[in-house]
């Protein structure tokens, strides 16, 4: 067959998309077309920050039906989402309550309990995953301790992409790359860790053994009656984004830039040394047995909140105003846990600057400048940290995802990190999702083969570092700003 049509459902924490890919196996051309885009946002339910799971499912089905109504024969479907959040089901397979967001404050104070009762080094030895207060391990502990009546109804727990695949196929699956984000998968066995799971109070019977990307979960029957296979792709959106990152060699790092920024490198072995633990490095699962050695950074969430609060709709105009301002007048630590979900992001940023005896950003452009400069400096700090961890410097950084469209931030990143930055592709998560589908359909050999297809079909923008820039001169001075209470504290 010359042409393949694959559908990627790509859900982020702020929006979702149904995308159609067309692959010409003869000429190895790959094109994407957006079929349906929709909003994803938090809602308050009984005092919890929850996801409107029914609305998301409705939009997914609407997007799939739009493709089918065009008369296109779909070869496969894949779903990727953000990590750590889950949906509870009863023994009839019906949903129990609404899924609570990782940004909800129910996990406050839970992680310190685990550090005392199990031990930080023991948790890290077992999971190899970074300590974030909203990891699934702490969410489940909060659930079982705070809502025992709800817990009693539960027979299964599915992570977000697995839930939507279940709703399409009727078959349950626990995909490996996303499962590793829970901090509950044993890094040596790739199965759920009995000790960590027992501590949460959740039953092991809620979960099936994690499966690696590439298996067919089941079929979705389209309105025309065709059975379309639903593939378990690398269902954590960052895992998919990394698959589509055209990494040149082992000296290339990646930065998946969106609501979250995830910065790291690929490795055939995990890094679980005391040094890695001290740096709060995570070893999330990737495709083909590779590890995504990385660190979570709060990312463009700060900007997204400011845009929403200030009702700013013209982002290019704001960036142009921001670029005209002097660099590094206002600096914060974007990974300070005060920025996870404040009532007022603008006020929180201003308070952080005030508390560190800095000028206080007032205008929208000043707030954006503060965010961009601070992110670029944090990227540089973490890249240096990771280079020391592996004992080799990086020579190139690939920025993928929606954030790679921000040319100002890309240049600031190149200047601060002191290495060449390659920006693109924008739709990295969607492309990585499609890549696993094409491998499952035997159209591509492996991830490296797929990256060659990406490189041939998608243009990248190069940013050369300027060592004389203002931000480059501030790199060494930024470290004290990170001595605030970070996400892992």
Swiss-Prot record:
List the active-site residues. 237 (proton acceptor)
Give yes or no: UniProt keyword Zinc: no
| Pfam families reported in the protein's UniProt record | FGGY_C, FGGY_N
Q: Does the keyword NADP apply?
A: no
Gene Ontology cellular-component terms listed: cytosol
InterPro entries the record matches: ATPase_NBD, FGGY_C, FGGY_N, Rhamnulokinase
So which cofactors does this thing need?
Mg(2+)
Identify the SUPFAM superfamilies for this entry.
Actin-like ATPase domain
Pathway annotation: Carbohydrate degradation; L-rhamnose degradation; glycerone phosphate from L-rhamnose: step 2/3
Recorded GO molecular functions are: ATP binding; glycerol kinase activity; rhamnulokinase activity
Homology family: Belongs to the rhamnulokinase family.
| Name of the protein | Rhamnulokinase
């Amino acid at each position: 067959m010359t042409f393949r049509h694959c559908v990627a459902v790509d859900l982020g924490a702020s929006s979702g998309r149904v995308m159609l890919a067309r692959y010409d196996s003869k000429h190895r051309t790959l094109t994407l077309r957006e079929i349906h885009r929709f909003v994803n946002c938090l809602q308050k339910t009984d005092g919890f920050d929850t996801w409107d799971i029914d609305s998301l499912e409705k939009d997914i089905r609407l997007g799939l039906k739009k493709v089918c109504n065009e008369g296109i024969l779909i070869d496969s479907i894949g779903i990727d989402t953000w990590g750590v959040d889950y949906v509870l089901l009863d023994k009839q397979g019906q949903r129990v309550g609404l899924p609570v967001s990782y940004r909800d404050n129910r996990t406050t104070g839970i992680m310190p309990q685990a550090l005392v009762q199990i031990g930080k080094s023991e948790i890290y030895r077992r999971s190899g995953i970074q300590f974030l207060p909203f990891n699934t391990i702490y969410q489940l502990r909060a659930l079982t301790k705070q809502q025992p009546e709800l817990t009693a109804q539960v027979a299964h727990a599915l992570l977000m992409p697995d839930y939507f695949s279940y709703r399409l196929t009727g078959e349950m699956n626990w995909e490996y790359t996303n499962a590793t984000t829970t901090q509950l998968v044993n890094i040596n066995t790739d199965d759920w860790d009995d000790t960590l799971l027992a501590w949460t109070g959740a039953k092991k019977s809620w979960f099936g053994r994690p499966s690696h990307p590439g298996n067919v979960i089941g079929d979705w029957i389209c309105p025309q009656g065709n059975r379309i296979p639903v593939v378990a792709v690398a269902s954590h959106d960052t895992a998919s984004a990394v698959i589509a990152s055209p990494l040149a060699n082992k000296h290339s790092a990646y930065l998946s830039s969106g609501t979250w920024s995830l910065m790291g490198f690929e490795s055939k072995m995990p890094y679980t040394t005391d040094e890695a633990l001290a740096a709060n490095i995570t070893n999330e699962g990737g495709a083909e047995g590779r590890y995504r050695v990385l660190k979570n950074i709060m990312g463009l969430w700060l900007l997204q909140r400011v845009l929403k609060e200030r009702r700013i709709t013209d982002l290019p105009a704001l960036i142009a105003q921001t670029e005209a301002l002097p660099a590094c007048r206002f600096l914060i630590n974007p990974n300070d846990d005060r920025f996870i979900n404040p009532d007022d992001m603008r006020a929180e940023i201003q308070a952080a600057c005030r508390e560190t005896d800095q000028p206080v950003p007032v205008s929208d452009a000043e707030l954006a400048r503060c965010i961009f400069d601070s992110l670029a400096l944090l990227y540089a700090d973490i890249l240096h940290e990771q280079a020391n961890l592996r004992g080799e410097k990086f020579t190139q950084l690939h920025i993928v995802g929606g954030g790679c469209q921000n040319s100002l931030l890309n240049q600031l990143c190149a200047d601060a990190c002191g290495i060449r930055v390659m920006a693109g592709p924008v739709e990295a998560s969607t492309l990585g999702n499609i890549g696993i589908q094409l491998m499952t359909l035997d159209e591509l050999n492996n991830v490296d083969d797929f990256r060659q297809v990406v490189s041939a079909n998608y243009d990248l923008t190069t940013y050369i570092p300027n060592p004389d820039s203002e931000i480059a001169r501030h790199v060494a001075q930024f470290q004290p700003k990170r001595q605030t209470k970070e996400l892992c504290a």
